[in-house]
């Protein structure tokens, strides 16, 4: 028998986390930063919460919906920025999911988030190198 109450609850939690993520993403856009390519990644909090509270698949869903809705709100849907954000966000969620599942005794959520940030940055720089800017000096931006 299908437990519709549990399914409904999960959908509500995912919706709330996506909404929280989009709000944090919007607030992050308003913060003046010293350089255009550096962000704090505060909307990643929702992905971490989804990972801990709901599971890996739901964390990926929250990430995908955050990138999709955020890109529609800011007019970057299907642009290179959208593609980079999508690939970086998904790679970050995957890495955080792996570290949360296999190494929870060794890393706190902050450490897991740092690995996710590193994965995001690395994937974005590699994609920018192969598809946009073909200069090896770009790799000096890696952390």
Q: Each predicted region: which residue ranges?
A:
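Loop-helix junctions at membrane interfaces
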Residues: 1-143
């Amino acid at each position: 028998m299908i437990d519709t109450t549990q399914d409904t609850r999960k959908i509500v939690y995912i919706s709330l986390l996506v909404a929280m993520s989009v709000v944090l993403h919007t607030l992050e856009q308003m913060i003046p930063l010293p350089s255009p390519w550096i962000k704090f990644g505060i909307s990643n909090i929702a992905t971490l919460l989804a990972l801990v509270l709901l599971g890996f698949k739901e964390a990926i869903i929250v990430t995908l919906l955050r990138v999709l809705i955020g890109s529609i709100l800011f007019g970057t849907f299907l642009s290179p920025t959208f593609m980079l954000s999508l690939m970086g966000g998904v790679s970050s969620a995957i890495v955080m999911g792996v570290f949360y599942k296999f190494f929870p005794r060794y890393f706190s959520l902050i450490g897991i988030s740092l690995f996710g940030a590193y994965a995001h940055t690395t994937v974005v720089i590699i994609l920018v190198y192969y598809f946009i800017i073909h200069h090896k000096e770009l790799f000096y931006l890696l952390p």
